[in-house]
Amino acid sequence: MVSTRQCSFCGKDILPGTGLMYVRNDGSLLWFCSSKCRKSMLKLHRDPKKLKWTKSYLGAKP
């Protein structure tokens, strides 16, 4: 059975054959469901807890 991944930024499930795997210089893997998530994390350094469309925002707010 093929396992699904979870987006490192928004927490959304990524289906097999989709998404983007980013490898940092230290060897750690980051999985992204879209370029929106990739750019928000790596280029713009946004905090996912402050964005309403992420799952971590829903977990941080009561």
From Swiss-Prot:
Which SUPFAM superfamilies does the UniProt record give?
A: Glucocorticoid receptor-like (DNA-binding domain)
Which Gene Ontology CC terms are recorded? Answer: ribonucleoprotein complex; ribosome
Q: Residues that bind Zn(2+), according to the entry?
A: C7, C10, C33, C37
Q: Which domain of life is it from?
A: Archaea
GO BP: any one term: translation
**Cofactor(s) this protein cannot do without:** Zn(2+)
Q: Where exactly are the zinc fingers annotated as C4-type? A: 7-37
Q: Which key words are in the record?
A: Metal-binding, Ribonucleoprotein, Ribosomal protein, RNA-binding, rRNA-binding, Zinc, Zinc-finger
Cofactor-binding details, from the entry = Binds 1 zinc ion per subunit.
* MF-aspect GO terms: rRNA binding; structural constituent of ribosome; zinc ion binding
Q: Which family does it belong to?
A: Belongs to the eukaryotic ribosomal protein eL24 family.
Q: How does it assemble?
A: Part of the 50S ribosomal subunit. Forms a cluster with proteins L3 and L14.
Q: What does this protein do?
A: Binds to the 23S rRNA.
Which protein, by its recorded name, is this?
Large ribosomal subunit protein eL24
Which species expresses this protein natively? Sulfolobus acidocaldarius (strain ATCC 33909 / DSM 639 / JCM 8929 / NBRC 15157 / NCIMB 11770)
What is the name of the gene encoding this protein?
rpl24e
